[in-house]
Amino acid sequence: MDRTTTIWLWLGAAVLLIILVGMTRGVLSLIGLGITLAAVMGFLVPALLRGGDSVALAITAGAAILFPVLFLVHGINWKSASALAGTLTTMVLAAGLANLAISTSQLRGLGNEDNLLIQLYLPDVSVTGLLLAGFIIGALGVLNDVTIAQASTVQELYEAAPRSRPMEVFRSAMRVGRDHIASMVYTLVLAYLGTALPLSILLSVSDRPLMQSLTSDVVATELLRSTIGAVALVLAAVSYTHLTLP
């Protein structure tokens, strides 16, 4: 079955809707999406195929995405610069947490069929390294989202009340941040759960004990992926809001 026409129609409709509603920002976000895909497919994937260090490559790819995208979409200003610094800092922290989680849980990434094929046909590529890089890149989107939101919040609070004490601004910004964290945490989990719905059905009809299923390689991978993203999200909101105060 040839799906080319259908796929292009849906992509075109999505692009048109983004441009109509987002206007200039919508166009810039699409350019940013192109930069993101170019960084991942043009740099990260070939470098991983050559057996490069997954942590260093994922962080480098993340920086290569953030530098142009943040300034392109949000402009060259204090908000973008501070969000960039906060996101990069928290991304490095997320990389450390992901590395610790994978090593302590002894994840091998072999519960996924694609990873098994990579292990079979591309022995020079580290499956665990791919897993780690995936954790880091996966956390990047939510980190960028929360740092930009908190930067905008702090900026608006100071503009509305320039004489406010830093701690007052921090408390007010964190009230907004808590709402954002609450929505983003379950959004993050639901995004992963949606992709793993067939697996969830298989687990529900399995005769294996629940804890044995939850600690299997494939399920533990998704659980830890969501957990690392959620922890990094909370740390980003708290630390970044504090760092932006004068």
Regions found by a protein language model. Name each.
Residues 1-9:
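Extracytoplasmic
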Residues 208-240:
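Internal helix-turn-beta structural module
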Residues 241-246:
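Conserved small/polar residues in nucleotide/adenosyl-binding loops
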Residues 95-219:
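Generic detector of multi-pass transmembrane helix bundles and their immediately adjacent loops
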Residues 9-118, 128-138:
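Transmembrane alpha-helical segments that form the functional core of multipass membrane systems
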Residues 2-3, 50, 54, 176-187, ...:
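Loop-to-transmembrane-helix entry motif
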